[in-house]
């Protein structure tokens, strides 16, 4: 469901019913948070966000204390407000196509670029700003030119690095903003099934109770992919498989990449291998 369509006057007029909420968002990762943000900023719809994990400041992996995985359910690394990326290094890539992600599959490139610019503004609003890379565009272009001589293509991306130590507090600020705008956020509550009436989503049943709503946005994230697949099959929705990218860790001495990474924080080089003709790339440098 496009959250934008829920902000139209006609929808708002009909949304005032005896339902518990106008919109229920399942999952409070990036997709769920941004859906709720768009709705509360552009409408007065009653929005409920349900997240099976915890609040950002309550997410803590016990492996940090005991050096052993306790297989917590739900996992604090993968589940909770902020999604599976809460404890990442907070690297923001402002580009419409990267790896398997290509926004131009869903919209024209100018529209995708406008959406990326809007996304950056929202991140900045909650303090998710940082140094912009490449720090020297001329040097970055020179690196790309040199790489091409060896059959290597460098993708120049506008990047920002937030840092894993700062990301949780910024996501907390975003969640608090949603609450202040009237969005209801439930944590440690798992959606079990979707209620459907007359071919339309009518609400959800959770580990606590049942909620009714005129619209349901499913954004369960990486940890909810299998559940999402089962829901899609249950209601006859089409499913497609995307290719996966398998990575290996290669360590080199800091002196080798330091000069490059001072200009480009996370350089993405593409190489078409000669032996098996595989399309490979570097990431998380």
Where are the language model's segments positioned?
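Dinucleotide-binding Rossmann-like beta1-alpha1 core, especially the glycine-rich loop
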Residues: 80-133
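Residues forming the flavin
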Residues: 2-4, 9-99, 138-285
